[in-house]
From Swiss-Prot:
Its main location: membrane. The keyword Nucleotide-binding does not apply. The gene is atpF. Belongs to the V-ATPase F subunit family. This is A-type ATP synthase subunit F. Gene3D superfamilies: ATPase, V1 complex, subunit F.
Amino acid sequence: MKKLAVVGDPDFTIGFMLAGISDIYEVTSDEEIVKAVEDVLKRDDVGVVIIKQEYLKKLPPVLRREIDEKVEPTFVSVGGTGGVEEIREKIRKAIGVDLWK
C-alpha cells in the first residue's frame, strides 16, 4: 500500500502528524520546498502528496510540469480555489476512475 506524504510549514503539518501521518516534510523556505518535492518524487512508496497551494507556485516550472504529468505520486494542493473539481480530476488521473459518477 502506498503512503501519504505531507509538505508544509509546521502549522500546516501538525494536524496531519496528530492524525498519524508519519511522512512529513516540514519546510520553512523556498529552497526547502523544492528539496522536499524533489525528495518525495524520488520515492516509490508514496502515492499521494498533500501540499499547500501557495507552495506549488514557488516551484520551478520544470518541477511543476513533472508534478502535473506524473500519475504517482498524485499531488493534492490544499488552500487554493480549485476545490472539489480539482481534487476530482486528480483522483481520476491517479486511479483512472471518476469516483463522482
